[in-house]
Regions:
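Extreme N-terminal segment that seeds HTH/winged-HTH DNA-binding domains in transcriptional regulators
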Residues: 1-41
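Basic amphipathic alpha-helical segments that dock to polyanions
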Residues: 17, 36, 47-57, 180, ...
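Helix-turn-helix DNA-binding elements, focusing on the entry/boundary residues of the two helices
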Residues: 33, 51, 89
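Key DNA-contact positions within bacterial/archaeal DNA-binding proteins
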Residues: 45, 101
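A short, conserved structural fragment
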Residues: 55-65
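Basic, amphipathic "hinge/linker" alpha-helix immediately C-terminal to the N-terminal HTH DNA-binding motif
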Residues: 66-85
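Mid-protein regulatory/catalytic core that forms ligand/cofactor-binding pockets
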Residues: 111-221
Length: 234
């Protein structure tokens, strides 16, 4: 069933909107109706109708500039939804061997039909991880990182460790998740920016001893923590 044909009052659709608002806001963006439509792949009128109902039901507020924000109840519900999704992603990748993109899609399907008790047991069985497979924190848990910057912003000669892949990439650049996994870039990977690539739209990096050319558009979704000279991965 397409997103356009669902009734916005259904639980799964409410959950989807709340999760989307949570994730966009978590990336530091202002959440506007146009951004929701872009992220979710639905029309502006569909989003407008959904926003009215979410406001009516007390899940979100809308400001004079048309930006939306979760209410306390909305934030609590959204965090619960995101927690379920990220725990399932971790289980699917770590225990069942799914790749990142497939795990994200399967977690979407499973999260609305599995009970809280099962989620809690899955969480315990995989050691209560701090993050999803892409390094995004499971709500209520706090990975200890230093300041994070985009890999695209590192200068030649800089070394860093990958901490997370932006949630934006999961929804707007899904092929990126698969390609990053294929070339060995994931949470905890150490990278060195060696020099500017001949193609101005790329940068050259070393990962696990291999030199790779990575598109800047991909590198901007990869959040890294800068390393000192003693930690140089080359």
């Amino acid at each position: 069933m397409s997103a356009e044909s669902r009734d916005v009052g259904t639980t799964t659709t409410v959950d989807r909107y709340l999760e989307t608002i949570y994730c966009i806001a978590g990336e530091g963006e202002i959440v506007r109706p146009s951004r929701l439509a872009q992220w979710m792949g639905v029309s502006a009128p569909t989003v407008s109708d959904a926003i009215q109902r979410l406001v009516r039901d007390g899940w979100i507020t809308i400001a004079s500039d048309r930006s939306v924000a979760l209410t306390e109840a909305g934030a609590t519900k959204a965090a619960s939804i995101v927690r379920r999704h990220r725990i399932l992603e971790r289980w699917l990748t770590d225990e069942l061997g799914f790749d990142w993109a497939a795990a994200d899609a399967e977690a979407d399907r499973l999260s609305s039909v599995i009970s809280d008790e099962v989620i809690d047991r899955i969480d315990a069985s995989i050691g209560e991880p701090l993050t999803c497979p892409h390094g995004n924190a499971i709500p209520g848990r706090h990975p200890r990182y230093g300041d994070l910057i985009a890999l695209a912003d590192l200068e030649p000669g800089a070394a860093a460790v990958v901490r997370r892949i932006s949630e934006v990439a999961e929804h707007e650049a899904r092929p990126l998740l698969r390609s990053l996994a294929e070339i060995g870039i994931g949470e905890g990977s150490r990278v060195l920016v060696t020099h500017e690539a001949e193609d101005p739209g790329h940068l050259t990096i070393v990962v696990t001893g291999r030199e790779l050319s990575l598109p800047i558009e991909s590198a901007k979704w990869i959040r890294v923590e800068r390393l000192g000279p003693a930690d140089d991965p080359s």
